[in-house]
């Protein structure tokens, strides 16, 4: 009996310790020292200890002469400019004064043991990991994290090279959410004259909660410039430049230690009372946890049963009638999705598209329109689209089309995306009136490669697009590419999976997928090779496939392509040939393609400049 009680007590204590999960410790100037390699000091990033592995996070960036506009700052952090404009009460054309704090929204995810948000960055002359981390990004990354992420030394960097920059961010722990109601964490870079109290006041947060979030105390609260702290927020941050700092909080009151008991026997008796109370309290907590797990288990079983029934109906060709009242689309969406996306009313979409008339149609089930004066692309989807909505809400990258909201009406979903004002890539490369320069074409190819690399290596979990083609790539006002149509995307944590359901666009599908149903990231690499060939030749995929099937060599196809200078033909040829190899194991990864295209683009820019 004693042994059982002892083990029960140990189990309770271990269980309760999970509720005291440490927050993120502030480690001071260790993060600014490139010589530090010990990860116990969090030099690679904050720990992945949040309740959710992916969450909405924010960082503060101070405008500089090089990054002073909404557009330039958004481009630096690979986020949508409209989000930056909205958070900072600024118009898209706003230019911030030097030093002004700008709120940047990011999707924070776990990469191994580290919590981070990955962005892409083009190396400038005289750049180093130290300069990028501490100057350009103002301490929001570290030398060590950059070297680890890119597996390249600082000395090997060259202008025009594209690298991945992990931004320091974190997701709230279960303790923060349950005890303090924290929903977001914002990474803030300390500057001279800053103190925890001053920073907390600026964002309307109690100093004690900021100290707690960074495992600090009133006695040990010194902070250093170019280091980051986390600001715990209950609501999304407001425009910091319009906030009026609240009065400073009163100094902490010292708590006197309890007087020692003059009677040792009473003290001992109290100790047993406290121990018993602790055991009973722990048992109560475990009971609550057990009940919660039981309820969730029952709910999951019920959900699985409903899904199996739904799948059977779908297989039999049945589509049960639905109404907005009978089916709540929010049931299939995560809480973060509901908070981050706008749920539109159907009449809003009718008004935006003139009641879905042909004049607003862009082919298939797609439409364009204006909602509150802003351009939008609206896609109608029959059946359940909650999985696609959940996926798109997790992605936050400059080269992935952004989902801004959705609508559910009479059994159909309507997804509302950001408007890519220059339409699809195919409209620009398959017509004789194309005005794209060679540099623009290669930049578009690099954007596509970067977007796929994000899906393959930085999304959590990784995804394979499965239907990449020139119709599914869209161009914004500045002809930067954004990958869309992720309805066929499939998550994969393995090197490959097999499927019996082959889908996609003819001319872009890899041999192993068509023949064996093998799905891997190399499926997207093959499709990317076809798109790259389309970009540099102006020919459609079906025509290119016919030429390749007839035995025409890639170099011969490229020679008859448009605008490609002779000196660069061999480099592009090698890249295309590698991407289109029949054996998927011999194709390059997308991060290798990003590196190759970065070099090709840099060489092309030099060639174009010298030809003027």
Curated annotation (Swiss-Prot):
Pfam families: LysM1_NFP_LYK, LysM2_CERK1_LYK3_4_5, LysM3_LYK4_5, PK_Tyr_Ser-Thr. It comes from the Eukaryota. Residues 283-601 form the Protein kinase domain. Residues 23-275 are extracellular. Autophosphorylated; induced by chitin and derivatives. It catalyses: L-seryl-[protein] + ATP = O-phospho-L-seryl-[protein] + ADP + H(+); L-threonyl-[protein] + ATP = O-phospho-L-threonyl-[protein] + ADP + H(+). Chitin binds at residues 125-131, 154-160. It is an enzyme of class 2 (transferase). One of its GO terms (biological process) is innate immune response. Its EC number is 2.7.11.1. Disulfide bonds join 48-110, 55-171, 108-169. The chain crosses the membrane at residues 276-296. Residues 244-261 have a biased composition (Pro residues). This is LysM domain receptor-like kinase 4. It comes from Arabidopsis thaliana.
């Amino acid at each position: 009996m004693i042994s059982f009680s002892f083990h029960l007590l140990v189990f309770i204590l271990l269980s309760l310790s999970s509720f005291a999960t440490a927050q993120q410790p502030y480690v001071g100037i260790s993060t600014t020292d490139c010589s530090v390699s010990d990860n116990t000091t969090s030099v690679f990033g904050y720990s992945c200890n949040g309740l959710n592995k992916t969450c909405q996070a924010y960082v503060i960036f101070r405008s500089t002469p090089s990054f002073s506009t909404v557009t330039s700052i958004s481009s630096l952090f690979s986020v949508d400019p409209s989000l930056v404009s909205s958070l900072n009460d600024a118009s898209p054309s706003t230019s911030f004064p030097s030093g002004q704090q700008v709120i940047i929204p990011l999707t924070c995810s776990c990469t191994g043991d580290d919590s981070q948000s990955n962005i892409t960055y083009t190396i400038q002359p005289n750049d180093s990991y130290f300069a990028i981390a501490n100057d350009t990004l103002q301490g929001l990354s570290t030398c060590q994290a950059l070297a680890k992420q890119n597996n390249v030394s600082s000395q090997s960097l060259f202008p025009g090279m594209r690298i991945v920059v992990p931004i320091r961010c974190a997701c709230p722990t279960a303790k923060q959410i349950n005890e303090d109601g924290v929903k977001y964490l914002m990474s803030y870079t300390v500057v001279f004259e800053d103190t925890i109290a001053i920073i907390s006041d600026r964002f309307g947060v109690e100093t004690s909660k900021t100290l707690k979030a960074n495992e600090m105390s009133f006695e040990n609260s010194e902070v250093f410039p170019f280091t980051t702290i986390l600001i715990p927020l209950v609501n999304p941050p407001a425009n910091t430049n319009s906030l009026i700092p609240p009065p400073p909080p009163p100094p902490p009151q010292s708590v006197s230690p309890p007087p020692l008991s003059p009677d040792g026997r009473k003290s001992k008796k109290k100790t047993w009372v406290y121990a018993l109370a602790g055991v009973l309290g722990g048992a109560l907590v475990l009971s609550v946890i057990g009940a919660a797990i039981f309820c969730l288990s029952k709910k999951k079983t019920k959900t699985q049963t409903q899904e199996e029934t739904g799948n059977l109906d779908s297989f039999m060709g049945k589509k049960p009638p639905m109404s907005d009242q009978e089916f709540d689309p929010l049931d299939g969406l995560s809480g973060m999705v509901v908070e981050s996306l706008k749920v539109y009313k159907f009449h809003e979409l009718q008004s935006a598209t003139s009641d879905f008339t042909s004049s607003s149609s862009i082919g298939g089930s797609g439409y364009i329109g204006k909602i509150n004066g802003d351009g939008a692309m609206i896609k109608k989807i029959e059946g359940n689209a909650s999985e696609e909505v959940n996926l798109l809400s997790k992605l936050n990258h400059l080269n992935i089309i952004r989902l801004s909201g959705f609508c559910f009406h009479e059994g159909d979903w309507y997804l509302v995306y950001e408007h890519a004002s220059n339409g699809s890539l195919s409209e620009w490369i398959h017509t004789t009136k194309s005005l794209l320069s060679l540099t623009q074409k290669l930049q578009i190819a690099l954007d596509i490669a970067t977007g796929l690399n994000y899906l393959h290596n930085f999304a959590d979990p990784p995804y394979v697009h499965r239907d990449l083609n020139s119709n599914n790539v869209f161009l914004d006002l500045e002809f930067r590419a954004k990958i869309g149509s992720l309805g066929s995307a499939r998550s994969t944590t393995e090197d490959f999976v097999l499927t019996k359901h082959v889908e996609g666009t003819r001319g872009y599908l890899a041999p192993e997928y068509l023949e064996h149903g093998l799905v891997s990231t190399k499926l997207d690499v093959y499709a990317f090779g076809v798109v790259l060939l389309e970009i540099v030749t102006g020919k459609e995929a079906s025509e290119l496939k016919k030429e390749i099937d007839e035995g025409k060599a890639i170099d011969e196809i490229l020679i008859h392509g448009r605008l490609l200078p002779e000196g660069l033909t061999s480099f592009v040829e090698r890249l295309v040939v590698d991407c289109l190899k029949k054996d998927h194991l011999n194709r390059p990864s997308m991060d290798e393609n990003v590196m190759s295209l970065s070099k090709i683009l840099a060489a092309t820019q030099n060639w174009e400049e010298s030809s003027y």
